[in-house]
Amino acid sequence: MADVKPYQIFPTVIYEFNYTPVDKIMMTSYIDQLKINTPQTPDDLHELSYFAELRDKVKEISKQYLDDLQYEYDKIEITGMWANKLNAGDSHAPHTHSNNFLSGVYYLHTNENSSPIQFFDPRVQAHVLRPRNTPNLLNASMMQYNAIEGRGYIFPSWLSHWVPTTEDKRISVSWNIIVRGEYVEPNTLQNAYI
């Protein structure tokens, strides 16, 4: 057998975390009592006291994400945090989170009938030809993660994702993060301070 060494290049990293905030009941009650006509709340939850502990945990894990991937930055800023309240029969169309670096979701209320989050492979060219296969991490065009109460995910904001039609109530909290600091090397005619 030949001496073959496979390389995996251009990875897309998603962090999973499990966490139960002290104010979980208050957070859920606050979202439930809001009288809104859309599935999303206003995006200022990170400024409310009920959500302060979750906000701080999100920043802590985002810092770990950036440090593990060896990014240089001055600070992490949450640009928005909102709740998504889906009822049976609702879905969330495919989307990305423009003008941000990291995004995330935390499941506040779910059960076994709550739809997962599904992420799409951003390399559209990789799926022009699709021989039959046994789906796995190396050949998938979509990956899904179950919506488990008390679990969260942090991912690159450019990564397209959606929520298929859910069979039961599902409350999640989502957020966006901008990374403040120098972007690109100096004198490249593309560098900026954001």
Regions found by a protein language model. Give the residues of each.
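Non-heme Fe(II)/2-oxoglutarate
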Residues: 1-74, 91, 190-194
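A generic structural micro-feature
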Residues: 9, 73-75, 96-100, 167-169
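A short glycine-rich, His/Asp/Glu-containing loop-to-beta-strand
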Residues: 76-84
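Residues that flank catalytic or metal-binding motifs in active/ligand-binding sites
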Residues: 79, 100-102, 113, 169, ...
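Catalytic core of non-heme Fe(II) oxygenases with the double-stranded beta-helix
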Residues: 84-154, 164, 179-191
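Ligand-binding loop in jelly-roll beta-barrel domains
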Residues: 159-172
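An acidic/histidine-cluster motif and surrounding catalytic segment
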Residues: 176
